[in-house]
Regions:
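Hydrophobic/aromatic beta-strand patches that form the interior of the parallel beta-sheet core
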Residues: 23-25, 37, 117
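Histidine-centered catalytic micro-motifs
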Residues: 35-46
């Protein structure tokens, strides 16, 4: 009983007393591990899984044009719900997502109870949710601000890469 009272869980905000919410299970014939962490994910890309895998330059020839044509906030929301369901079923409790419409992604993370970082993707060229790198950075800043006090969900600015962002854009994203 004293142990149950002392049981605590760490959160982004500090220590939260959690003793009464835990359920004791019989794990004698099982392996118990902590929740897994996915540190590189594109939750909204579920509809494109496996498509264009045979393309030589899959990103530029297939994915970017497909995303610009087909991806919108509602598709990102539905895809994210599906992807988080898969993550939770496989033992992932924390995810770093880097994609588009991350304000929608962050909301779904919150609704589904996963711990996550929703990172707005930044590229030089236009994408399905931003006209340019500056707009994407502004979206990321707004997301960081909106979730700065949330116990499980955080916002971030996530530059796509060195081949899709200039050195100046990378510096702006860092700042």
């Amino acid at each position: 009983e004293e142990l149950e009272k002392a049981l605590q869980a760490l959160t982004a905000q500090g220590i939260l007393k959690a003793g009464e919410t835990f359920e004791e299970i019989d794990a004698k014939r099982a392996i118990v591990i902590p929740g897994l962490v996915n540190t590189h994910c594109h939750l909204g890309m579920i509809p494109f899984r496996g498509l264009g895998d045979d393309c030589k330059d899959r990103l530029r020839v297939f994915l970017l044009p497909m995303e610009n044509q087909a991806m919108d906030a509602e598709m990102a929301r539905l895809s994210t719900r599906y992807a988080i369901g898969e993550l939770l079923l496989s033992g992932v409790t924390t995810v770093l997502d880097m994609y588009y419409f991350e304000e929608v992604v962050a909301k779904v993370m919150d609704e589904m109870g996963i711990r996550g970082i929703a990172g707005e993707t930044v590229m030089e060229k236009d994408s399905c949710d931003s006209k340019n790198a500056d707009e994407a950075i502004e979206r990321g800043i707004a997301l960081i601000e909106a979730y700065k006090d949330h116990p499980r969900v955080s916002g971030a600015i996530t530059p796509h890469g060195t081949t899709t962002c200039s050195p100046e854009t990378l510096k702006r994203a860092y700042q």
